[in-house]
Amino acid sequence: MVDVLNIESLDLEARGIAHRDGKVLFVEGALPGERVTVQTVRRKPSYEIAKVEEILRPSSQRVAPRCPHFGVCGGCAMQHLAPAAQVAIKQRALEDTFWHVGKLKPARILPPLYGPTWGYRYRARLSVRVVPKKGGVLVGFHERKSSYVADMRECHVLPPAVSRLLLPLRAMIAAMSAPDRMPQIEVALGDEAIVLVLRHLLPLTDGDIAVLRAFAAEHGVQWWLQSKGPDTVHPLEREHADALAYTLPEFGLRMPYRPTDFTQVNHAINRAMVSRALKLLDVQPQDRVADLFCGLGNFTLPLATQGREAVGVEGSKALTDRAHEAAARHGLGERTRFATLNLFEVDVQWLRGLGYFDRMLIDPPREGAQAVAQALSLLAPGERPRRIVYVSCNPGTLARDAAIMVHEGGYALRSAGVINMFPHTGHVESIAVFESLDEATVLQAQAQARQKAREEAERLAEAAAA
């Protein structure tokens, strides 16, 4: 059945949203404001998924996708939408999530942070598959919503130097001893090097090593090898062990890293994000600052250039060790301290044990920082950070944690905005600023939270006894 629909909005999977007979329809390939004919491909009791058959009235924000693989490759979802419109949709999604999850509205919306629209992806995981029906080896991202590897010949979100490697990598893998046992190549670009990490399930032969070295010499890349888990990753050539690094020129910092370490995908936006975070945090020379989920010290070291002391906390000792080394190399060893701790299991006593912080930066993974938010909400007015900047890659967990800090802890959500870290995708990176309110308001919020918790415990006890 073919329907004619008016598209009302867009979700973060870049599907148009329409309604018909009280049912929601998610329409692949449609944009807000468009009138389209669609074919339903999946029916559920409360919604349907459809695809566009014909665009009867196109959106003024529709643009021609640059990539010939768009729509098949799962690496991008929004190339058919103007970049400014992509950011506007992400900003609306952030605001909607704050309200629906946390019943919160930021007092101020920060202007979006923009960066390069193309060639920005300095870190990527490429899958490798042998597919005889498609001519042999494929190297690229998965197809959209599929486990199949897309038949990619170019990629415009990868830097051009990496995009040009896609076809040569196919030929290289095909020339090796066991191409069907090499499932993955990770890409990591530093400011001065391109590193490729080959995942191989069988030992490499001398011939394989020769092929890798010839490829590296021809294309100007460096190979690292991974035979099992992350701890087996090592450079093919020993002299390449310290080649990868990114810079934060505003703070005079060079940050070395390993190719499988977490670093931000978009180096240009990372520089802008660090700069904005520190401006929002407004660190003073006498301030002691915490950086939770600090990783390699992406924020910790810049913070140490401005405050009295920066304390980085992270769950991986390997990362905190390297952050400490980087701080020492920059002469920041006496102004930094690092601790290894699982931040998903902390409590208020642990937080008190670290001492008083004037400011705090939180930059968690997608799971958010619920335990940290709960601990912060329990701190007394005189023992809590006055200002907190929270950098998030998941609006849902940010809104959840914000609700705890505001409704239970007496913080105010002063401002929030999006960071266009991942153009053409549905990923939403954002930043939010919280400030502790006056003592009376904090104590009132904490008392109300305790009362609500008691009432909920009584309700559960009554339900269990019934």
From Swiss-Prot:
PROSITE patterns: SAM_MT_RNA_M5U (PS51687), TRAM (PS50926), TRMA_1 (PS01230), TRMA_2 (PS01231). GO terms for molecular function: 4 iron, 4 sulfur cluster binding; iron ion binding; RNA binding; rRNA (uridine-C5-)-methyltransferase activity. It catalyses: uridine(1939) in 23S rRNA + S-adenosyl-L-methionine = 5-methyluridine(1939) in 23S rRNA + S-adenosyl-L-homocysteine + H(+). CDD domains: AdoMet_MTases (cd02440). SUPFAM superfamilies: Nucleic acid-binding proteins, S-adenosyl-L-methionine-dependent methyltransferases. [4Fe-4S] cluster binds at residues 67, 73, 76, 155. InterPro entries: 23S_rRNA_MeTrfase_RlmD, MeTrfase_TrmA_AS, MeTrfase_TrmA_CS, NA-bd_OB-fold, SAM-dependent_MTases_sf, TRAM_dom, U5_MeTrfase_fam. The active site is at 393 (nucleophile). Keywords: 4Fe-4S, Iron, Iron-sulfur, Metal-binding, Methyltransferase, rRNA processing, S-adenosyl-L-methionine, Transferase. It comes from the Bacteria. The keyword Iron-sulfur applies. GO terms for biological process: rRNA base methylation. Its EC number is 2.1.1.190. Residues 1-54 form the TRAM domain. S-adenosyl-L-methionine binds at residues 264, 293, 298, 314, 342, 363. Belongs to the class I-like SAM-binding methyltransferase superfamily. RNA M5U methyltransferase family. RlmD subfamily. Catalyzes the formation of 5-methyl-uridine at position 1939 (m5U1939) in 23S rRNA. PANTHER family: 23S RRNA (URACIL(1939)-C(5))-METHYLTRANSFERASE RLMD, RNA M5U METHYLTRANSFERASE. This is 23S rRNA (uracil(1939)-C(5))-methyltransferase RlmD. It comes from Bordetella bronchiseptica (strain ATCC BAA-588 / NCTC 13252 / RB50). The gene is rlmD.
